[in-house]
């Protein structure tokens, strides 16, 4: 009996040591829901070494809450790094070389490897030297198609980049989900070329996916005032921007139900980091379009990278409603800051209906 009691006591101690207790725990509003986690632009976490652990905390938290939140996928709005190919940092707009930045963001996503399918898109800072001077991108070096075994069951199409090589710059992922049927998430490159838009259009029009609910993820689409970009001033060419993405891809496609982007933002109140609009597609259905990019929330462009803010997208059992909540694992881990872990205003917590 003494041996059994001692063994039980050791098990209890080990369990308590391994199960970290946090002041704030995120929960679904319905036990029959599932969720996706939306990570905003990582670049300002990644460009400074002292900020990098915050982004890794966000991905670690996501992995640890896989069961609790019934997480099915993780989305990231792009700008994985601040400079794609810059060997000498200026110590103003970052103190990390491009190699160090790519290594850091890769290390953060290792927290999700072989646990969850994560879907990233490329931003303007992921191309060229500093910001889309050309189409050169290091994504495929650090995020090859074979990297995460959770992609094996869901990665269904990989488009070609500007060099004609298949990479995750343009990729599609199929998720079979209770109450929601088949969802196709398409990640579209920054300022997509005609070929990239046509690849996505052919995919959504195909017999195989015409009855799927399609979620489009792309880096740049609209600004912080929810104005869809007509054009942007980057050197990369050829390129298309928000208005063309809408007119040639989203508007005529009855199965594209929602668009998510990042990129935009300004220093100031939190409403400068987010925007939202609804427009009708060619079939007369409402299409929610959501921009989320919290990177200046933690002290501006040279602050801590965004205070750890992410969004929990709860897909309700009715098969059409998504509850959006804005949460910071960074604030949630300490009793000192736990009261700030949720943002509760109308721009931070709302519902989207997919028609």
Task: Give residue spans per PLM region.
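Conserved beta-sheet core of the metallophosphoesterase superfamily
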Residues: 237-317
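Active-site environment of divalent metal-dependent phosphoester hydrolases
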Residues: 45-47, 82-84, 122-131, 168-171, ...
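N-terminal active-site segment of His-dependent metallophosphoesterases
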Residues: 19-97
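Active-site neighborhood of phospho(di)ester-bond hydrolases with catalytic His/Asp-centered motifs
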Residues: 38-40, 72-79, 117-123, 188, ...
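Bacterial Sec-dependent N-terminal signal peptides
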Residues: 1-22
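Extended active-site neighborhood of metal-dependent phosphoesterases/phosphodiesterases
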Residues: 86-198, 209, 269-291, 311-314, ...
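A short C-terminal boundary segment appended to hydrolase-like catalytic domains
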Residues: 30, 303-355
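Active-site-proximal segments of metal-dependent phosphoesterases and phosphodiesterases across multiple
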Residues: 90, 94-98, 195-198, 207-257
């Amino acid at each position: 009996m003494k041996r059994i009691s001692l063994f039980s006591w050791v098990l209890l101690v080990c369990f308590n040591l391994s199960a970290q207790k946090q002041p704030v725990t995120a929960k679904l509003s319905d036990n029959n829901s599932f969720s996706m986690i939306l990570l905003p632009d990582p670049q300002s976490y990644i460009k400074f070494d002292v900020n990098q652990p915050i982004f890794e905390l966000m991905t670690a938290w996501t992995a640890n809450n896989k069961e609790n939140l019934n997480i099915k996928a993780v989305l990231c709005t792009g700008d994985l790094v601040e400079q794609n190919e810059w060997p000498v940092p200026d110590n103003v707009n970052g103190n990390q070389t491009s190699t160090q930045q790519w290594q850091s963001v890769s290390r953060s996503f290792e927290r999700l490897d072989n646990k969850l399918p994560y879907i990233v898109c490329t931003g303007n800072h992921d191309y060229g030297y500093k910001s889309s001077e050309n189409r050169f991108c290091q994504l495929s070096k650090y995020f090859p198609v074979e990297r995460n075994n959770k992609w094996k069951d869901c990665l269904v199409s990989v488009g070609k980049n500007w060099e004609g090589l298949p990479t995750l710059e343009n990729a599609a992922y199929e998720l079979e989900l209770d109450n929601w049927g088949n969802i196709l998430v398409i990640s579209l490159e920054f300022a997509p070329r005609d070929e990239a838009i046509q690849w996505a259009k052919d995919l959504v029009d195909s017999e195989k996916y015409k009855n799927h609910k399609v979620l489009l993820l792309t880096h740049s689409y609209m600004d912080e005032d929810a104005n869809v970009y007509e054009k942007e001033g980057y050197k990369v060419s050829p390129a298309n921007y928000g208005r063309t993405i809408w007119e040639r891809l989203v508007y005529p496609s009855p199965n594209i139900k929602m668009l998510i982007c990042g990129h935009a933002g300004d220093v100031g109140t939190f409403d400068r980091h987010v925007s939202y609009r609804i427009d009708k597609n060619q079939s007369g259905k409402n299409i929610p379009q959501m921009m989320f990019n919290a990177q200046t929330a933690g002290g501006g462009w040279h602050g801590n990278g965004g205070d750890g803010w992410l969004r929990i997208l709860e897909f309700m059992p009715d098969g059409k409603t998504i509850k959006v909540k804005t949460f910071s694992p960074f604030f949630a881990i300490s009793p000192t800051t736990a009261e700030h872990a949720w943002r509760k205003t109308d721009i931070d917590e709302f519902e989207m209906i997919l028609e």
